[in-house]
Amino acid sequence: MSSGTLYDKVWDLHRVADLPGGSTQLFVGLHLIHEVTSPQAFAALQDKGLPVRCPERTVATVDHIVPTISQKRPFADPLAEEMLSTLERNCANYGIVLCGLGSGRQGIVHVIAPELGLTQPGMTVACGDSHTSTHGAFGAIAFGIGTSQVRDVLASQSLAMNKLKVRRIWVDGQLGSGVYAKDLILHVIRSLGVKAGVGYAYEFAGPAIDVLSMEERMTLCNMAIEGGARCGYVNPDGVTFDYLQGRFYAPTGEALHRAVAWWRSLASDPNAVFDDEVTFDAASIAPMVTWGITPGQGIAVDESVPTADSLEPSERPISEEACRYMDLEPGMAIEGVPVDVCFIGSCTNGRLSDLKAAAAIAKGRHVAQGIKAFVVPGSEQVARAAEAEGLDGVFRKAGFEWREPGCSMCLAMNPDRLEGRQISASSSNRNFKGRQGSSRGRTLLMSPAMVAAAAITGQVTDVRKLISNTVPSKSFHQ
């Protein structure tokens, strides 16, 4: 009887050769590229006169540097315009599909690949971006790579990799009202630490994971990297297969039936042996907010900033540093902390279900005075679907700005930036110093619904209080 994990099975299927020193040459089934980490890689190929080995397995988009208020060309930023033009030239020269602006398929790379059906169970997926682990939601092994490795994949369609250990994160029960996958992963990272996953792949499993939608699973896997794991994944199941059916690049007809049969066989076997296992109770998890300068510095919205005596000695220096930077006092409640900017979007939480959750809070309410709040769909497809359901109107009526797709304020590579000491409520994935533009800017990570609640009240607010006062509506057009 087979007794392997999904990670073991996918690794073995993609092994090309065992290399000196213990690493493995691993075939890459899908290579995703964007405008920031690909120019130098293409330049290296050109210097050596090398072709792209498998252009049909490479797909490009533009996301990091694009403005979200107006995407009219040429961009006001000449560097951003040059980066996009370079990507367009490279894709044309090497025969690579580019999901460009206005194509109907452009968006954040980790949003468009799943929605187009490019990401499928059993694949190895590589991209020059930290949050490539997103694609593990499909039962793929997906990892972020650096520019030199982007070059290697373009040239050889393979990478030299060291095999990881596998930690199973089992989650019992179900998440409560107002608690989302974002809260679950922030709770996991808080509990295990930002370095606990080093050398590991995280397998997310258990009753609470089984009932998550694909978009929620993507949020979960997206932030596995923030816990130190090289990748995170969920075993493929009926939820996965239903999501893929009808997607542009997904198999159809008899090919789909054969694919599903094979995809099912990839799941970790019941008697699979893991290197480590950790169990969580979903029902005990509350809406989360980060208070510090790492994603591991998170607390439930009804908790207080940790005091020194509640922390391990090794945690105290960075906690003190975080409090100084964030202008927070140990022991103070996180609920009620005022915010300046509220951002809903990113590869973590810029999908349709994320926008729906936030719109449900915004509907019939209005952004607090003095708060800048904006919504950035993760892709052109997400934007059009949201507009078809009337979500853009809900947000605009509530005082939010409705933007064009892109990475936006997740990182400081485009015009969407914090200024000075502004503090943001953000549905993105990193709260490092200066991450959102200003070298002195501050970031509070939370779910899209929590961001919407902060926008409405002007401060960190337990979204469950607003949910209890929300009248259910079947349509956002009402």
From Swiss-Prot:
CDD domains assigned: IPMI
Record: residues binding [4Fe-4S] cluster: C347, C407, C410
Enzyme Commission no: 4.2.1.33
Biological or metabolic pathway of the protein: Amino-acid biosynthesis; L-leucine biosynthesis; L-leucine from 3-methyl-2-oxobutanoate: step 2/4
UniProt keywords, alphabetically: 4Fe-4S, Amino-acid biosynthesis, Branched-chain amino acid biosynthesis, Iron, Iron-sulfur, Leucine biosynthesis, Lyase, Metal-binding
Pfam families named among the record's database cross-references: Aconitase
Catalytic activity of the protein: (2R,3S)-3-isopropylmalate = (2S)-2-isopropylmalate
Coiled-coil region list: none
Iron listed as a keyword: yes
Cofactor: [4Fe-4S] cluster
Cofactor info, note text: Binds 1 [4Fe-4S] cluster per subunit.
Xref: InterPro entries: 3-IsopropMal_deHydase_lsu (IPR004430), Acnase/IPM_dHydase_lsu_aba_1/3 (IPR015931), Acoase/IPM_deHydtase_lsu_aba (IPR001030), Aconitase_4Fe-4S_BS (IPR018136), Aconitase_4Fe-4S_dom (IPR036008), IPM_dehydratase_rel_enz (IPR050067), IPMI_cat (IPR033941)
Alphabetized NCBIfam families for the sequence: leuC, PRK05478.1, PRK12466.1
Family in the record: Belongs to the aconitase/IPM isomerase family. LeuC type 1 subfamily.
Its job: Catalyzes the isomerization between 2-isopropylmalate and 3-isopropylmalate, via the formation of 2-isopropylmaleate.
Subunit organization: Heterodimer of LeuC and LeuD.
Record protein name field: 3-isopropylmalate dehydratase large subunit
Gene: leuC
